[in-house]
Amino acid sequence: MKKLKVFLVVSLLCCGLSMSMAEAKTMTLDKTKVLVPQGFSVANDDLKFKKGTVVELNENNEVITGVLNRDIALRPTGWRNVINDYYEESNNSIFYPRIFHPFTSVSIPFPTYAHVRYKGNKPVTFATDGTVLSGTIDEEVTVSVNKDKYGLITFEDQYELGFYPDGSVKNGRLRDDALLRPYGFKTGLAGDEMAGFVEFAGGKDISFSKEGYVTSGVLKKAISWQQPDGTMVTLPAKTMISFINGQARY
């Protein structure tokens, strides 16, 4: 009976390992080619992945992660919270617009349909619904940090913008200084007059918890912080600070 139990446990472990190995695989592309990301119901001929790069595929040969061949508009996982409703396209051709004005560039707004332009030659990761969990954005994006709370932040282009599966922001680069709550603020900033909001520096990387609290970022000004053991520390400005389980580290 004991041998049977051991056999069953080993068999289950082997089956689990086989299933996990079957669920995802990688492939190096010998040429730039059209591949279909997971969650797509209609293939896009313009969505190509770069030659010589590695793509991660699921069991249906759909792309989980891959390197884009060129800039392309895709829908981010947090698209419901994004307020980029239009993008501008400029042209000074004699054929566009119809009335030609020499040395004049005309910008015309086009609806985005909740899409964001992602940068080519950079990796993107797709969620199971076909939206982009993470990728390098090629335009500034203004979005609610948490899907259930009010508050808009603009993230810089040319940097990665990541989302949690529920659409809340996971990480990005702040365009401007912003007042935000660090993770663990209830104990770390007990009695604070600003209700736990402190200023984080723009032009720096930042990451958030699913609830919209800062888990790492660069402070604009030094602040006092109470660690879980009750000790008080000064967190310096212009330094990347991590907030983990109520403890601040740098």
Where are these regions (language model features)?
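Bacterial N-terminal signal peptides that target proteins for export
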Residues: 1-8
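Glycine/tyrosine- and acidic-biased, solvent-exposed loop/turn segments at the edges of beta-strands
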Residues: 23-250
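Bacterial N-terminal signal peptides
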Residues: 9-18
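N-terminal Sec-dependent export signals
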Residues: 3, 21-24
